């Protein structure tokens, strides 16, 4: 009896304690306004423009002209404050929520940091071009799918815009603005020395050790014909000195479209009243649908809200690194899963990376990297205005039109009488979001291997072979029961599209570097020869008129659409010679010169080769005797550069004549199929070049 009483008492205490913890947690989770000021160490001057971010979230702000900030956060959150030239400070939110003073400590030791540049590395202090580096630690704990999303607002002179709000969608990156009128404007992405062709959307951000942006011609000219829009160098994780390290990183959360700042839509009663008054004001008979607005009481259909959902997001990453005297290894495995805020929208990415480096002897090193990834997404056609995007069309659908019928089933379409002014048939866009398939899968494999030999002190010979294999499959199926457009009654003609893209790219690089110092003179020389080849095969089949929507295969369509069915092959090749020399005296007076020659199959026979030189110089003023005693000046360098870069994103066969095979001829008094040249060849087609002159003060 006593034991039963004790058990009941224990259960009551556990219940009360659980309830207390639950309500305590709820109260702690409430956000409040956090205010403070950011100052510099020593002079205690305020710092305007400092970045203030709630760690682990995308909530952030910047300090005003007086160094003050205001941000929404919860007790227990951590504020991460950063500014160029200062070490990042992390401030936990405890009891104090106002007038928080953050003191930024100057970060001068990074001048001796080694920074990755084109085809090598340099001391940050000795760089004469415009270069900015972001480390993986700076970008950690941000719940986004793409590395470029993490860079927004962090890089001077780099504009990053999201093309759509769909999960996993890529970003438009512009380095120092738009530099081309007709050719491509995206920067060149180089992953572990390999200029990739398939974009970086499939790369797991947690695989990245650091990222360097090359902005001016002095820093990009070694990439020649592809560097006019800037270069992004990505270095992935390697094994670090010490014992084996294992790290598991996981986060989860939810996303939704906030009600704040949404368009305020009429409810059904307000809409019917509005229509009734408009007819009365015009002196016209009021249609029966609007004569009694109160009949729609409690029957409002918010089409926009019906298309939205609370979307979970989760990310898992396992990182294993080890480093011994002989071998360095890093393994990163990741899984990212994000639902979209629109119904039937989702994005999944599976990724794996293996980086190994083995020291065969004091003179020989070999390495191998392998990075497969698999991405699958489904995204309803939400973009566009009237007739193309379901969100826009849903906003214009009358709230008196039902989403569900009396049996609780989704309606097919709505159309009122012409006297109501409703001249279009409105398909059920909720049904369209759920039933229309817009699926894309991408399998991508990046791999490279290298052999490095150092025959004498200061001389290094390195040969690499790189390959990228990419397979993309797209499937779109619009069943007869749904439509995303307007003025389309159901059933409609079912249509399917299947498209396959197969890419293969390889690159061979052979580089020699020689570094030498004597007295206070230091120089290094780089020479190299590279070859790259790319091939793409595309196959597309479009079918329609399906007897049964449950069989959306090509064979299930009664008609193969010839206009939407095609195939093609595209290839290009690039051969290059390159060289660079860096010289400095006492690390104070710095000169650098580089040149690259590119031969591309994309250009005319008379203009196939292009030459892209650059020269730059720097003077470290802070090392001069007349500035040694300047207490508030930790580092100062003036630099200037002049160079030429190119852009070869013009298509693979622009230099050739174009033949149109849809032209008809009259032969023997009969019209017969034929072909004709629709545009002439251009053997003098050449490079689009950009000349840049820069002066900077660091």
Task: For the regions a language model picked out, list residue spans one by one.
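Short, small/polar-rich motifs associated with maturation and membrane association
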Residues: 1-17, 23-353, 358-367, 371-373, ...
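Hydrophobic residues in alpha-helical membrane-spanning segments
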Residues: 49, 400-403, 614
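Flexible hinge/switch segments at interdomain interfaces of large molecular machines
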Residues: 121-127, 293-297, 422-426, 483-485, ...
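Extracellular/periplasmic, surface-exposed regions of secreted and cell-surface proteins
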Residues: 139, 185-186, 314, 349, ...
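Intrinsically disordered, low-complexity regulatory/activation regions of eukaryotic proteins
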Residues: 151, 488-489
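Short, glycine/acidic-rich hinge or "gate" loops at secondary-structure transitions
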Residues: 167, 381-386, 480-481, 627-633
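A surface-exposed, glycine/aromatic-enriched loop/edge motif typical of exported proteins
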Residues: 256-285, 373-419, 476, 533-550, ...
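Core alpha/beta catalytic barrel or barrel-like domain that forms the active/cofactor pocket
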Residues: 379, 482-484, 592
């Amino acid at each position: 009896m006593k034991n039963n009483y004790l058990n009941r008492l224990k259960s009551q205490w556990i219940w009360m304690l659980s309830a207390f913890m639950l309500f305590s947690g709820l109260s702690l989770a409430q956000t409040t306004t956090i205010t403070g000021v950011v100052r510099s160490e020593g002079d205690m001057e305020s710092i305007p423009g400092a970045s203030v971010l709630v760690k682990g979230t995308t909530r952030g702000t910047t300090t005003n002209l007086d160094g003050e900030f205001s941000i929404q956060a919860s007790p227990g959150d951590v504020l991460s404050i950063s500014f160029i030239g200062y070490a990042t400070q992390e401030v936990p939110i405890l009891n104090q929520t106002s007038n928080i003073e953050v003191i930024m400590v100057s970060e001068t030791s990074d001048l001796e940091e080694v920074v990755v540049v084109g085809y090598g590395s340099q001391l940050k202090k000795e760089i004469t071009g415009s270069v900015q580096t972001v480390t993986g630690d700076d970008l950690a704990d941000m719940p986004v799918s793409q590395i470029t999303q993490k860079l927004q607002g962090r890089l001077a002179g780099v504009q990053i815009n999201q093309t759509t709000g769909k999960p996993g969608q890529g970003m438009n990156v512009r380095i120092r603005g738009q530099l081309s009128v007709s050719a491509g404007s995206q920067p060149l992405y180089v992953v572990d020395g390999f200029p990739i062709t398939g974009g970086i959307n499939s790369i797991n951000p947690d695989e990245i050790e650091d990222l360097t942006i090359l902005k001016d011609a002095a820093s990009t000219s070694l990439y020649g014909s592809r560097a006019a829009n800037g270069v992004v160098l990505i270095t992935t994780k390697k094994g670090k000195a010490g014992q084996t390290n294992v790290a598991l990183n996981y986060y989860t959360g939810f996303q939704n479209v906030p009600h704040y700042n949404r368009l305020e839509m009429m409810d059904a009663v307000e809409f019917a009243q509005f229509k009734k008054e408009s007819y009365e004001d015009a002196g016209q008979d009021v249609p029966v649908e609007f004569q009694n607005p109160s009949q729609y009481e409690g029957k409002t259909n918010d089409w926009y809200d019906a298309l939205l959902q609370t979307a979970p997001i989760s990310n898992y990453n396992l990182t294993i690194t080890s480093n011994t005297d002989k071998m360095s290894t890093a393994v990163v495995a990741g899984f990212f899963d994000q639902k979209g805020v629109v119904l039937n929208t989702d994005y999944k990415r599976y990724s794996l990376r293996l980086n190994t480096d083995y020291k065969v002897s004091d003179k020989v090193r070999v390495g191998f990297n392998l990075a497969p990834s698999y991405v699958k997404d489904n995204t309803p056609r939400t973009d566009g205005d009237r007739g193309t995007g379901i969100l826009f069309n849903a906003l214009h659908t009358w709230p008196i039109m039902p989403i569900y019928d009396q049996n609780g089933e989704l309606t097919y379409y709505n159309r009122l009488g012409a006297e109501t002014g409703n001249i279009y048939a409105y398909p059920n866009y909720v049904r369209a979001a759920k039933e229309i398939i817009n699926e894309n899968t991408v399998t991508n494999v990046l791999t490279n291997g290298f052999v490095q030999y150092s025959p004498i002190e200061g001389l290094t010979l390195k040969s690499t072979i790189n390959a990228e294999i990419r397979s993309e499959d797209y499937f779109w199926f619009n069943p007869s029961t749904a439509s995303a457009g307007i003025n389309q009654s159901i059933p409609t003609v079912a249509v399917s599209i299947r498209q396959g893209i197969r890419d293969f790219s390889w690159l061979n690089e052979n580089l020699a570097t020689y570094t030498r110092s004597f007295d206070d003179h230091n120089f290094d020389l780089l020479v190299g020869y590279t070859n790259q080849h790319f091939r793409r095969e595309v196959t597309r089949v479009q079918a329609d008129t399906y007897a049964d929507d449950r069989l959306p295969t090509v064979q299930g369509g009664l008609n193969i659409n010839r206009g939407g069915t095609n195939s093609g092959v595209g290839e290009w090749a690039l051969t290059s010679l390159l060289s660079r020399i860096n010289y400095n005296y006492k690390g104070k007076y710095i000169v650098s010169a580089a040149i690259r020659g590119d031969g591309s199959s994309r250009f005319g026979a008379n203009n196939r080769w292009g030459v892209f030189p650059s020269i730059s110089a720097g003077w470290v003023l802070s090392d001069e005797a007349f500035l040694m005693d300047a207490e508030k000046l930790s580092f100062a360098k003036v630099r200037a550069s002049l160079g030429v870069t190119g852009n070869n994103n013009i298509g693979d066969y622009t230099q050739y004549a174009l033949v149109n095979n849809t032209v008809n001829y009259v032969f023997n008094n009969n019209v017969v199929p034929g072909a004709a040249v629709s545009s002439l060849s251009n053997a003098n087609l050449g490079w689009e070049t950009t000349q840049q002159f820069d002066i900077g003060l660091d």
